[in-house]
Amino acid sequence: MSHNSQVEDNLALSTCCCSHKFEDGYAMLEWMANLGFKKVELSHGISINLVAGIIQAVEDGVIGVSSVHNFCPLPFGMNSPMPNIFQPTSRSQREISLWKRYTEETIKFSQRIRSKKVVLHSGSAWFFFKSPLYKLMNWLEKNDIKESELKDNQDFIKVRDKLMLRVERASRRRYKILKESLQSIEAFARNHSVQLGVENREGFTELPLDADHSEFIKSFDLDSPISYWHDTGHAEIKALYGLLDHEQRLEDMKSHTIGYHLHDVSDSGDDHQEIGTGVIDFSMISRFIDKDTHALVLELSPKLSEDAIKRSKDNILNYLN
């Protein structure tokens, strides 16, 4: 097998672009295979009624599964993506117990369909009163400024920094709870031979905060299944806001990264766009990708056409090869 074909065989498509269209999991995976993919990521919109067909399709060799996104399958009675419905940072012990239960269900499902990687969201800061985020959103609505100009706008920086100061204060106690929650599933993940990738998020109040993400992941033991999952779109959005340096994040986390969500960001800040149509420097990102060990997942908007999905596949392969 040539190197190029090996990279193509390992490139996965996330079901986030199509799971809402199907009532049969087998038909869904056949549709994705017919687009030219050998692997998929099962995202957080997989309802229970899709599971039997998915398992059968995997057993029949229709397609492979590179990764699974928590919670998958969805908790019983839920039919739309709800990756944050139970948070590992909650003030409610009952909610944390539900997070643990359904995360373990995801880990078991991942092993069942021969996937060794699970993507996790990891909660958020908590505010007794209204989240201060609304002040920043109001400022953005009132000021007609391009996303690419925000990080250099002094008025925006003042509003942003005031917000982040409050978020940082509100997150302090959440980190202890988050670490305990993740530690509570370490042994379970290890026993199922599954790695857990804590994803970088686009939300201002979601944890780990960008300033803390690297240090937080590195606080786990070297043999821990807790690792890092890099989302290119989320990182670029945070870079547009001046909250991180995209390249530096990749450098800091290169020895802890287990996978990538690959999608572009438009100049207006919309993510999950067709690769090559936005502002992300995929040539830079490709330097950090280990094509042999990293899970590589196209995570595209359900609004994109089949042709846009195929172009994204071709474009990212051009960068990777």
Language model segments and positions:
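Histidine-acidic metal/acid-base catalytic patches
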Residues: 1-17, 22-33, 48, 100-120, ...
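N-terminal pre-domain/capping segments
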Residues: 1-106, 111-115, 137-154, 173, ...
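A generic structural signal for ordered alpha-helices
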Residues: 10, 32, 36, 77, ...
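Generic enzyme active-site microenvironment
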Residues: 39, 197-199, 229, 297
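Generic detector of well-ordered alpha-helical packing
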Residues: 42, 70, 200-201, 232, ...
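Active-site acidic/histidine proton-transfer and metal-coordination neighborhood
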Residues: 88-227
